[in-house]
Amino acid sequence: MKSQNQNLLVAVAIWLACMFGLYLFFPERIGAGKRAPQQKPEAPAQAPVTTAPAPPAGPVGSGATVASKAADVPRGTPGPKPPLRTVTFETPRVRVVATSEGAAIQSVQLLGEKWTRHKGTKEESQIDLVSPRASEALPFTTVVTGTDGKALVTATTAYALVKSDATSATFRAEEGGVTISKTFSVNPEHYGISLLVELKAAQGISGQLSILSGTHAEEPQGGFFAPHTSTPARTICAAGNNNVERLAIGAKHPVFEAPSAQFAGIDEEYFLSAVMPPAGVPASCRLEAHGEKSGSLIASLTVPVQVAAGGDSQLLFQGYAGPKDESELMAVAKPLKQSIDLGFWAVIAELLLGIMKFFYRVVPPHNWGVAIILLTLAMKVLTFPLQHKSMKSMQEMQRIQPQLEELKKKYAGDTQRQNLEQMKLFKEHGVNPMGSCLPMLIQMPIWFALYKTLQVSVELYNAHFIRGWIEDLTSKDPYYILPVAMGITMILTQVLTPAPMSNPSQKTMGYAMSGFFSLLMLTLPSGLTLYIFTNNILSIAQQMYLRRKLRPPPVKASGQTVEVDKKKDDRSGGSGGASGRAKIRA
């Protein structure tokens, strides 16, 4: 039947959209740069604040040409190089190591059981937001250039440690006729790191100051069935007007510049290292991606600087190094919230995350897997009226199948008339030919939005469902139990759906699509698979309930007129009337 074929084509199109939609709408999961493997930083030899000598730094790599506009020029005859010193700050949230080499941040290690990479493996380690191979541009590396482009202070300037305490450290250097002091301060109440830069020059300065951040990245990895395990690393710049740009290794255009910027830094999907300009000071940003197979990602935030002869200038930069938790970002600065990229499905994703947060907060045992199950139940309750209407329409479609077949035979040579009569029949019986597709059309945006939520929301990072089985809802099911169970429930759902599938090949195709969809889910987040599996279970229960509720009432025998064929009645010895009809009452 034509309507059946149309429904089949629509169903196939929808399933294909499900299969390819994740990769169409979210290419960055497969195409983004991958962070280099983390190395465990050495624990401080002393208490939270240390000033320990370190071995001489090796030669600076090609990435030392950060901020390409600020060319590195000879510095003349340098004075004695001060010893390399490090200072360690430790708060309840982070362990920060500052180095005198360039007066930059050498390590930002997030503390707590949640903040680990490769959890449950031999490579498990605390998350460090500074790449061990980012020596070309450690966070808060500073470059000062004059109006002629000459570098007055370079990225590799050697600083001396002047003073330090439990939450701050000051480094100082003299180079190119400029005295520069950099004071780092950490706040135990949040993930903020502030940097106060003080410049002095006997002959004055007119130019610009750039704060740099870099990381090592590799070329995009993975394919169609790539595991959901990579951690993308990209440079990021909030260029104003809610325009946030990101740049990864392998980008078509390896350089991005914006004349205005609210912050710039390194975005690792769940984590952010960024710096913001001083209040009221205009800033620009520049993002760079060096290398083809692997290389450096460098972000720079540049502000104008003006120092009168014999005078000084102070600039206070606010930085952030931590998880992209909305409340934590807002505690430091509101613009940082723009780093949370929920993409095309942002409105739905924010709603889903809000519902899950509510369930996680109020329902014991405060488990994100349970929150996903309750989210599924809530969505099912909200869509129940539509599901009810859809199933009623499908059951009515089954009941009028004989009439549709008669119309098909009657108007076999007139397709236009056949379609017209079918539509009249649908209208007469309140049947919507597309009714069976509506529930799935509603679920698809939820699937895509939930996938993006799992991909971005740090609340779900390393969030377990059942210990020993699913330790991270943002990663695949390590034992593939959920994808297999999901495939079985999808087949059961098709069996119970009252769709007119008289053609065996159509049923076979439906089962094959369920199997292929399960195969697709093998490498996708277990949280998404848990949602679809729970939705299938609820759909099975709902269909069983609606089949009983919408079951047509039995035909009553009382008062029914039965037509009796006169010839058959005569042969059986009955006494038929002249009209050949008899009324039989129960």
Where are these regions (language model features)?
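Transmembrane helix interruption/hinge and helix-loop junction motifs
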Residues: 365-367, 519-529
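Membrane-interface amphipathic helices and adjacent TM-edge segments
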Residues: 5, 310, 381-447, 491-522, ...
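Conserved catalytic motifs of ABC-family nucleotide-binding domains
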Residues: 449-490
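Core hydrophobic alpha-helical membrane-spanning segments
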Residues: 11-23, 447-450, 484-489, 515-516
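Hydrophobic core segments of alpha-helical transmembrane domains in multi-pass membrane proteins
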Residues: 486-487, 527-536
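Alpha-helical membrane-interface segments at transmembrane helix boundaries
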Residues: 356-364, 426-430, 434, 470, ...
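Membrane-protein biogenesis/insertion across secretory and organellar systems
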Residues: 1-381, 553-586
